[in-house]
Amino acid sequence: MIAKIGRYHLCEEFSHMRLFHEMFRTFRLDNVQWVPLGKWMGRMYRLFPRFPEAFMAPPAFVTELMGLTVYQHIDGALDKILADEPKARDRVRELLREIMTDELAHVGQRRNFMGPIGLGAARLFVEPMYRAFFRDLPETRLLFDLDHMVRDGKTFDYSAIAPEMIEKSWVPSYCKTLPRSEDGSRFDNLRRG
């Protein structure tokens, strides 16, 4: 069952390329050339399939979390970057949120199959994996606050995700936010396994 879910998510990852291409077309960048991963990330992704699931699960979880973090930061910057292009901004946000909805499910699926040891390992991997990945992207310094992204990865919380995205995606039941009390506060921030 886990392998089938993984294959389904891999198909979604490939469909994201179509959505990214549509974003580029929104900016009339029809001739974008996709480049391979940098040296370190290329090596890491070649090694991933060779490890047993128990060893692969924490770094796989972190890569999904990293994607979601990047998309959240891009989404947060769209209003400023595309302030004078509301149609383009709205179209890019629509496409980006489709990807984010899938990524949210991928994070949930990966989280669902990790026990406390795997989750602890994933927490240790967040900073080095984020830094290694973004070191290979020269645009990082111009587009992102890497320290902020690392912090967001380490403190990821489903309650920070837009409710309409959670409604469309899949989130483990033990990670869903609890209802608010009469005074508006949450009984508990997040249920965790």
Regions found by a protein language model. Name each.
Residues M1-G193:
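Non-heme di-metal
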